[in-house]
């Protein structure tokens, strides 16, 4: 038996405590708002076909999506512009079991913007 196996229960309990704190923070936020918006990633999309060689950097690209996943909340990403001809995304997070709010917001957003129609230069339309 390795040390990790001996502490599995303690790690699991601690992870559940952290998850509960994250969920509580979202519950507090949703008492004042219908949706929460964040960037989807820290920057623009990667070049097509490129793979990051640094797993930590790849993990950090998902940083903004982790909290919604841990809290069990619905979330989606919408096109929200571009940087150097590479798309950037807007993440919309909804309250627990409230997918209609993020879908309605996404529809409203796309009727007011045209980012969903953007095709990067060099891509087929």
Language-model segment annotations:
Residues 4-24, 70-125:
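Structural helix-boundary/capping segments
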